[in-house]
């Protein structure tokens, strides 16, 4: 069975084609700048070589169509015909409380995603464009939606509700939803496979730390809490997002800066976090380099960043009555040893003991805690696309 996984943003499409017989990636790439000048596709060829192809793409339908043409291209394609694609799986950022698991797409699913656009206007609108483009080009191929927040749907109400009048939750569905759920689900399952443990007996804290970052508490295979909230702005400090901030600080700044609500949201999402503190970059690699060269604000940002992750680890250990495994994943979590070490330092009282040599690892599955550490700390590279492909295959087989 061959499954195409799509992640459609407002002006981009990331794709991977899987052969589910052995979970191998047959093709991968990304379309950028849809609807803008100088649109292009970055393709990873079967031999591993990367190629950039310029192509005019006024809308998502043309973007999807061009992806299809690349997949079947006689020279660089991975398949001979689109008939070889058995299904298409989509990443959907916001499923609200309408979708608690992955679903096969029909009209009601489309309508549901559209109804949630006010919770994730940029993301969900892009996802819908991708869904509809595939439907126009391959109407007979089943499509599946895998929701970013579905894994977090097992949170108890006392964890996901905000302390505001209850009728606002009932009327507007204002609550903690969480994000990166497909990644948290993948690494929590994969780490137990890797360690040979039963997930139903483990208390796991998963740290998805990339430019966007979130921490989740996974108790006996189910998410019981997560750091992101109604939107991906809440929680730990991120590349350009503030993370948790006193709401009164927001209204105070709106008054001082003369910003409207949407302008303030953009400010907290795009000009804050590590970028806001350093004034240099949202890229943690650049911040580590700047700190090493003596930049004091870069050093401050690193301390703030790790400190906030550490606080969430401690909080979630308390929420679960202890912790057995801590997992690091995503761009920063998989590759930056300093962030991992600083975030775990001071957690010896929980039973965390790091192995500094093992912690040198980058981007591969590894145990990075000491042999005598009561808590096992691991790096597990995430694979959200494979999780989406597996969900898609499972739903088709269960039909």
Give the ranges of each region predicted by the language model.
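Short beta-strand-loop/turn "lid" adjacent to the catalytic site in phosphate-handling enzymes
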Residues: 71, 75-123, 144, 151-159
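General beta-strand structural signal in soluble alpha/beta enzymes
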Residues: 90, 121-125, 142-147, 153, ...
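Glycine-rich phosphate-binding loop of actin/hexokinase-like ATP-binding domains
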Residues: 151-255
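Glycine-rich beta-strand-to-loop/alpha-helix junction loops that act as flexible
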Residues: 9, 90-93, 209, 323, ...
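Phosphate/pyrophosphate-binding loops at sites that engage ATP/ADP/AMP, CoA/4′-phosphopantetheine
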Residues: 70-85, 191-198, 313-324
């Amino acid at each position: 069975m061959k499954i195409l996984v799509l992640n459609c943003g407002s002006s981009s499409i990331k794709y991977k084609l899987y052969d589910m017989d052995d979970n191998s990636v047959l093709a991968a790439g990304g379309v950028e700048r849809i609807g803008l000048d100088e649109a292009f596709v970055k393709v990873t060829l079967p031999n591993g070589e990367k190629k950039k192809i310029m192509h005019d793409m006024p809308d998502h339908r043309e973007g999807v169509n061009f992806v299809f043409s690349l997949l079947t291209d006689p020279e660089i394609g991975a398949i001979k015909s689109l008939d070889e694609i058995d299904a298409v799986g989509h990443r959907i950022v916001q499923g609200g409380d309408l979708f608690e698991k992955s679903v096969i797409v029909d009209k009601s699913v489309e309508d549901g995603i559209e109804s949630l656009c006010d919770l994730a206007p940029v993301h969900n609108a892009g996802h819908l464009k991708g869904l509809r483009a595939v439907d126009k080009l391959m109407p007979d191929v089943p499509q599946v939606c895998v929701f970013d927040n579905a894994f977090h749907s097992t949170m108890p109400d006392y964890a996901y509700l905000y302390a505001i009048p209850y009728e606002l939750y009932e009327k507007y569905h204002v609550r903690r939803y969480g994000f990166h759920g497909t990644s948290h689900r993948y690494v929590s399952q994969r780490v137990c496979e890797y360690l040979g443990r039963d997930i139903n007996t483990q208390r796991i804290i998963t740290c998805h730390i990339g430019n966007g970052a979130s921490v989740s508490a996974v108790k006996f295979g189910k998410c019981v809490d997560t750091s992101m909230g109604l939107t991906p702005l809440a929680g730990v400090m991120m590349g350009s997002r503030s993370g948790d901030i006193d709401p009164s600080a927001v209204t105070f700044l709106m008054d001082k800066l003369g910003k409207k609500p949407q302008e303030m949201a953009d400010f907290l999402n795009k000009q804050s976090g590590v970028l806001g503190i350093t004034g240099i970059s949202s890229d943690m690699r650049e911040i580590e380099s700047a700190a090493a060269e003596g930049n004091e604000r870069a050093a401050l940002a690193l301390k703030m960043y790790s400190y906030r992750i550490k606080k969430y680890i401690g909080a979630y250990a308390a929420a679960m009555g202890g912790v057995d495994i801590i997992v690091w994943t995503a761009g920063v979590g998989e590759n930056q040893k300093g962030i991992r070490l600083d975030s775990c330092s001071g957690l010896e009282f929980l039973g965390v003991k790091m192995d500094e040599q093992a912690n040198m690892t980058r981007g591969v599955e590894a145990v990075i805690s000491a042999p005598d550490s009561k808590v096992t700390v691991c790096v597990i590279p995430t694979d959200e696309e494979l999780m989406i492909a597996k969900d898609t295959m499972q739903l088709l087989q269960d039909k």
